[in-house]
Amino acid sequence: MDSGLGSSYPEERSGPPEIRPEEINFEELIGTGSFGKVYKGRCRQKAVAVKLLHKQNFDAATLSAFRKEVHLMSKIYHPNICLFMGACTIPGRCVIVTELVPKGNLETLLHDQKIQLPLYLRMRMARDAALGINWLHESNPVFVHRDIKSSNLLVDENMRVKICDFGLSALKQKHKMLKDQSSAKGTPLYMAPEVMMFKEFNESSDVYSFGIVLWEILTRKEPFSHHRELEKFREAVCVKHERPPIPNDCLDSLRRLIEKCWDKEPISRPSFKEIISALDHVIIDAAISDLNGRDFWKKSFLTEQEVPWEAFIDALCNWSKAPARNQCDKTSIDYLNIKCLKAVLAESPKSEGTGVETVVNIEKFGKILEFFGPVPEPAPGHSIMDTVREILSQKWFHGDLDTTEAASRLNGQPIGSFLIRFSSTNAGCFTISQVVDGGSIKHQRVSRQGVKFNYQNVIYNSLIEIVSKNGGGANGDVKLDSQLGVPNYKFMSLFCVLNKESEVYQ
């Protein structure tokens, strides 16, 4: 529907971001806050978000302050801050126009348990938010957001997070303090104790709020959900120093960060620069469970979550004390090791135009280590690459395959035919898919018990041993026979001897 705001506007403009009322078309309502309603809309042929302010009867001083805020907001540019595109500052018609962030706010995503959000992804989202807030805090003058909460973190189509809603933001010079005079501004559940107690505060109040958000991102629960009365809540947080309970299985690095952020002493809280650095470690811990794998990634790519294959393999060879790729003979085991690891780990970059053919993603690296780990201590003579090569050399190993594709490859094969693949539901586990009596396909899990493998309640030292010892056969099933392994020609081709003088390393 049309905004209905009329077409008259003053000739004097407040600056480049001023938008005429007739340029804005309102569509459906997508959110409501204390200062206004947010609509999906269109402006100058672009899909946008339009915030219609509840309060429109501005006096001259308030209108001047609003226009000043609009002017300041127009100068904030950062990938993790919702892009301010303009505003109408005409009295009675005040709206703010921003980019439209399609997946809504983080609060809604977190509390919808049907949506899968792995811890690694959630911690990456937390880092995005920290990057945006850090940009505000490092500005001059300093922006103190004052209302950091999960509903003010928007999520785009790539699951990247952007800070929004600067309605309560305060500007201050560095090293200066702020103080509320009449009422504490912000959302009580996320509000720092010093703000609730009308004490002086600074940007560290945003750090406290972020600590509560970080707990919410971790647990996917509402903070302080048992509190109902504001006064009792204020006493619990400000006097008794109550904080939400951190789960026992929380990563140690994440626990330490949360506790630092919501410290009762503002001066003890970290800056957002320090928070970002801590989250770099947390993200690696969340993506990689193998301790040596974590050590490798932190020493090699601490701030990166995706790296070019060449940079990755050079770093891994150096860390594991294996021969460098440019020193390997094409017929050597070391060269074959590199080819095999690339076959299961490297993938095309998600972003176009990078100029890089293949990359390694930290999350996939962590999963591969769960399948082939643990990673041995760095030493000449054996590395994780040897383990990968040994498994890929078995004709029956098919790697990353879902149930449907596994059944397709076994269709029409003799009874007893089988293949082994990664489990599609349990990281670190494998699945044996086999043709049984009647020609149907049966899928059975091989679980990990430390470095050993459990198949049908029998413990084996390796996948290869399960096959070589003719594992299985319980409950009338067919025992495994290596002769009936269905070949995976993709992996088998890696083991062809290279003779061409002109062949270059791939």
Curated annotation (Swiss-Prot):
The family database entries (CDD domains) matched by this protein are listed as: SH2_ShkA_ShkC (cd10356), STKc_MAP3K-like (cd13999)
Q: Name the residue ranges with Basic and acidic residues bias.
A: 10-21
* One GO cellular component, as annotated: cytoplasm
Q: Major place of localization?
A: membrane
In this chain, the stretch annotated as Disordered covers 1-21
Provide the Protein kinase domain boundaries.
24-284
| Span of domain SH2 | 396-488
By its UniProt entry, which SUPFAM superfamilies does this protein fall under? Answer: Protein kinase-like (PK-like), SH2 domain
Whether Transferase counts among this entry's keywords is yes
Q: Which cysteines are joined by disulfide bonds?
A: none
Keyword ATP-binding carried by entry: yes
Pfam families in alphabetical order: PK_Tyr_Ser-Thr, SH2
Intracellular or extracellular location(s): Membrane
Please provide the record's keywords in A-Z order.
ATP-binding, Kinase, Membrane, Nucleotide-binding, Serine/threonine-protein kinase, Transferase, Tyrosine-protein kinase
Q: Which GO terms describe its biological process?
A: signal transduction
Which residues of this protein are catalytic? D147
For this UniProt entry, the molecular function terms from Gene Ontology, in alphabetical order, are: ATP binding; protein serine kinase activity; protein serine/threonine kinase activity; protein tyrosine kinase activity
Q: Which reaction does this enzyme catalyse, per its entry?
A: L-seryl-[protein] + ATP = O-phospho-L-seryl-[protein] + ADP + H(+); L-threonyl-[protein] + ATP = O-phospho-L-threonyl-[protein] + ADP + H(+)
User: Of which family is this protein a member?
Assistant: Belongs to the protein kinase superfamily. TKL Ser/Thr protein kinase family. SH2 domain-containing protein kinase subfamily.
> What PANTHER family does the record tag this protein with?
DUAL SPECIFICITY PROTEIN KINASE SHKC, SERINE/THREONINE-PROTEIN KINASE TNNI3K-RELATED
This chain's protein is named: Dual specificity protein kinase shkC
Please report the organism this UniProt entry assigns to the protein: Dictyostelium discoideum (Social amoeba)
Q: What is the lineage of its organism?
A: Eukaryota, Amoebozoa, Evosea, Eumycetozoa, Dictyostelia
**Annotated gene:** shkC
